[in-house]
Amino acid sequence: WKRVTGVQTCALPISWVRINPCDGQGITDDNITEYRHCLVESDTLSVEEQWRIVTSLNIPCAAVVFSGGKSLHFIVKVHAGQNRKLYDDRVQQLYSVLERYGFQVDTQNKNPSRLSRLPGIWRGRQKQVLLATNIGCESWQEWVIQPRAANIARWVATEPPIQRFVFKGIVPEGAICGIDAKGGLGKGWITQTLIMSACTGKTLLETFIPDGPMKVLWLESEDPESELHRRFKKIAAAYEFTEWDLHRCSENLIAFPGQSFPLTRPAGGSVEPTEHYEWVYGKVKEYQPRLIVLDPRSHYYGGDENDNTQVGRFMGLLKELTGAVDKGAAVWVNHHTSKEREQQISSASGRGASAGRDAQRVLFGLSGMTLNEVQGFKIHDPHLYVRMENTKSNWTERYSKVIWLKRETGDLGGVLKQVDLSRTEELK
C-alpha cells in the first residue's frame, strides 16, 4: 500500500495498467504475448446500469474497476491464448451480446493492448476502486454455452428490428436457405443464376429481387471450374450482361469451384469444426459477403448424414457464419433428396437426418412437369420446364405460387429463365 500511495504524486500514466501481458519491448498490439482479457466500458450508461447488465449476463470478469469518472472497467476473460483472430472474434461476440441487452459499448477498447485504471489511485477527487474480482462464469467457455434470457423489457419498450433480405421478401438475412432436389433438375444452374443476380444487383429470376449488388462467397464442388466458367458465359449472354454487370461479378464474387473439404469431423458423439471451417470463417470475416453458398451440403459435411445431433451441430456452425458478417448474411445450402422422395416436392424431401431441413428457414424444391400439366399447358417439350416451389418459409410469408423455369436451347443450352405459363408466347 505504501507503494500505491507513493505514486499519487507521480505522472498521470502511472495510474494505468495494461490488461494483457507484454513482451517488454513495447506497448502496442504487436507486443502482446497472450490474449487473456478484453476491456468492456460504456461512457453513456450510469455505473449502476453498467453493473446490472454485466452481472445479469454472468460475463466472466477477472476484475471490475471503478474508473474514478463515469464508467466501470470490466476486465473480461476471453482466454484466446496467442490467437489474435480468436481474440478479435470473441471480443466482437461479447460486444454484440452486450449491445443486444442495451449496453452501449465503447468499441475503441477492442484492441488487446488497452489500458485500464489502476485501483487505489486518486483521479482528481475520486479514487479508482477495485470493486470485484472473478465474478460471473469461471471461464469464457462456460459463459459461451450458457443460455441467455431475452430482454423482455426491451421488447415492451422498443420496436423490433426490421427484417432485412438478401432477395426481397423471400431470402432473409441471418437464415440458412437452399434447394432440396434430385440431381439433374437444375439446382446448380438456378443457384449460379441467383449468385450472378446478387453480385450485380440485377433481377434475373423475377421472383428473386436482389437487395442491391452484394458480395458472394461460393463453395461449389460438384462441377469443375471449366464447367462453371462455361455456365457463367452462357448466363451472362442469356441475360444480356453489360460490361458494368461483368465488372460487378468480378468485384463481388469469390468462388472456390471443384473442391470439396469437410468443415466438420466426428467428435464425442457430435461433430467439431475442422481447420477448413476455421479457414472459411476467416474468409467470411475478411470478405464480408451477404450471401454464402455451399453446393452440395454432403461435400462439406464430415459426419453421419443420418445422425440428428451431428447434422444439427453442422447446421449450427453454418449459421454462425452469418454472425461474422457485420451487415448480415444468408447461407444458401443445396442438398439432394432421398431416393424414395425424388418425385415429391416438400420440406421433408431432403436426404438424411431431419435436423438439416429443420435448421433451414427457407427451402425450395424442384420437379419436372406432370402429365396433367403438360396437357393442360399444351407443352411440346416438357423436358425444358422445371417447377420450383417454396416448400418452407419460417420468417416470412411463404411464396405460394409455382415458379416455372424454362431451359434455353442451342448455344445457351442449360440456362434457366422464369416464365409465365399463362402467356401463350412463353409456350413456344
What do these predicted regions represent?
Residues 3, 62-69, 106-111, 246:
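Short beta-strand
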Residues 7, 11-70, 77-93:
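Signature for HUH/AEP ssDNA processing cores
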Residues 40, 61-86, 113-119, 331-336, ...:
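Histidine-centered divalent-metal-coordination microenvironment in nucleic-acid enzymes
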Residues 49-56, 78-103, 126-144, 372:
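Helical (often loop-to-helix) elements that flank the catalytic cores of nucleotide-handling enzymes
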Residues 75-82, 104-130, 253-265:
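Short, conserved secondary-structure transition motifs
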Residues 146-235:
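The Walker A/P-loop phosphate-binding site
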Residues 211-305, 409, 425:
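Conserved inter-motif catalytic segment of the P-loop NTP-binding fold
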